[in-house]
Amino acid sequence: MKSRIRLLRLSPLDEVEFIAAARRSRALHSPWVAPASTPAKFEAYLARMSQPEQNAFTVRRRDTSALVGVITISNVVMGPLRSAYTGYYAFAPHAGQGYMREGLEAIVRHAFRTMKLHRLE
């Protein structure tokens, strides 16, 4: 079955849609996460996720390109350990429809096949 999503690196072009989605999803996210909901916060998040040990990916619907959520691979340690952490959140109204599950499956493949990690927590 063809994936319903595409993973793309977070970029400055995502700012307007990301902020709108974060604002629309406040009730969904509170109190667990607080995605960037202002231009200044988005720019700071993008700068942090642009560091070599940080990676942020948007999860987008393949059919409409709508922003579904975000998945991160962070605190990447290379060398013998080759380890990282992952985090994710969906945006309303896409939560609960399986898009993030597909995104996580794709990010795990990326982490182990492309990044050659040994461990993902």
Predicted regions and their residues:
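Conserved acetyl-CoA-binding loop-helix of GNAT-fold acetyltransferases
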Residues: 89-90, 96-113
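Conserved GNAT acetyl-CoA-binding A-motif
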Residues: 114-121
